[in-house]
Regions:
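Phosphate-backbone recognition surface of nucleic-acid-processing proteins
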Residues: 2-5, 9-92, 96
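Low-complexity, acidic/Ser/Thr- and charged residue-rich accessory regions of DNA metabolism proteins
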Residues: 46-47, 83-139
């Protein structure tokens, strides 16, 4: 996990300590829910509410993921490109905070894969779902 630029030992220790044994989660989606980062809609009847994160879950885990965003986006080119993609995409661009939540969820998926499957961090595999012209990681 230290191979990911912008992620330090304190972040890793907090991420591992807060949820406990990562292997008890069947998917990274469960960790996102555990952290309270899953989207919920506030709607009633014909009223269509806006989407937001639920905030039901581990507050400290959310805080750890939020605090790692500044150094991660400053030092890690791949995560910065994912963030920029979410903010500037033509169809459904996200606001800055929404993009940070999306990148946090991506980081959870990377952490989960490294810790449960025993794979190494691979920036090309991580970027495979983002298709953007002029990307520095063109496949």
């Amino acid at each position: 996990l230290l191979a990911i630029k912008g992620v330090g030992s304190i972040t890793i220790a907090g991420f591992i300590a807060e949820p406990g044994d990562i292997r008890r989660f069947d998917s990274p989606k469960q960790i996102q829910k555990y952290a309270g980062l899953e989207p919920v809609e506030n709607s009633s009847g014909k009223h269509k509410g806006r989407m937001r994160i639920s905030k039901c879950g581990r507050r400290k885990l959310r805080k750890i993921l939020y605090q790692v965003m500044a150094p991660l986006l400053a030092r890690n080119r791949e995560f910065r490109e994912i963030y920029d993609y979410y903010v500037t995409r033509v169809k459904n661009p996200l606001k800055r905070r929404q993009a940070m939540v999306a990148v946090s969820c991506k980081l959870i998926r990377v952490f989960w894969a490294v810790l449960t499957k025993g794979v190494d961090y691979d920036k090309f595999k991580m970027m495979s779902d983002i298709h953007r012209e002029g990307s520095f990681i063109a496949a």
